[in-house]
Amino acid sequence: MFHVSFRYIFGIPPLILVLLPVASSDCDISGKDGGAYQNVLMVNIDDLDNMINFDSNCLNNEPNFFKKHSCDDNKEASFLNRASRKLRQFLKMNISDDFKLHLSTVSQGTLTLLNCTSKGKGRKPPSLSEAQPTKNLEENKSSKEQKKQNDLCFLKILLQKIKTCWNKILRGIKEH
């Protein structure tokens, strides 16, 4: 009862819930000369970019992930950490082994270069999208195609943002 009255008296959730982050990370970016990025990650990101074939109209849709997580100043490592973990979810999709290899290399390579130590409870990663109830086989097939197209759009945007964020980090290091 005290908890309920506290929330209603002050009109806000308990302050402790607002101030505590879900998970924070300390990252120490290794390979600051850019060699590992240029020779391994960049090559694999470009290969993945070329493997994803779709119209550019999906680039106008900005998924919520990018509204919540961005490569702002002093948040680059945190963004890359989250983005790499998001890439791991795509490994569960029905994709070619070559595609999985490149995706795994980018995800694992980024996490290795970031060298992050997580301070927080591990959370189960959310699924790529929620399951939709099926009405008939034809609608189900088209919705699966649409879901796959949306996932590939998201992946394409995510790869571009990862590349941009790495370039931002390397430019900042070279300027200092």
Curated annotation (Swiss-Prot):
Q: Which GO terms describe its biological process?
A: bone resorption; immune response; interleukin-7-mediated signaling pathway; negative regulation of apoptotic process; positive regulation of B cell proliferation; positive regulation of T cell differentiation
Q: Does the keyword Zinc apply?
A: no
Q: Where is this region: Disordered?
A: 118-143
Q: Where is the protein situated, by its record's location annotation? A: Secreted
Where's it mainly located? secreted
Query: What GO terms fall under cellular component here?
Result: extracellular space
Q: Which domain of life is it from?
A: Eukaryota
Q: Does the keyword Signal apply?
A: yes
Q: Where is the signal peptide?
A: 1-25
One example of the protein's molecular function in GO is: cytokine activity
All disulfide bonds of the chain are 27-165, 58-153, 71-116
Which SMART domains does this entry report, sorted A to Z? IL7 (SM00127)
Q: Which UniProt keywords apply?
A: Cytokine, Disulfide bond, Glycoprotein, Growth factor, Secreted, Signal
Q: Which PANTHER family match?
A: INTERLEUKIN-7
Q: Which family does it belong to?
A: Belongs to the IL-7/IL-9 family.
Name of the protein this chain belongs to: Interleukin-7
Native organism is Bos taurus (Bovine)
Where is the organism placed in the taxonomic lineage, from the top?
Answer: Eukaryota, Metazoa, Chordata, Craniata, Vertebrata
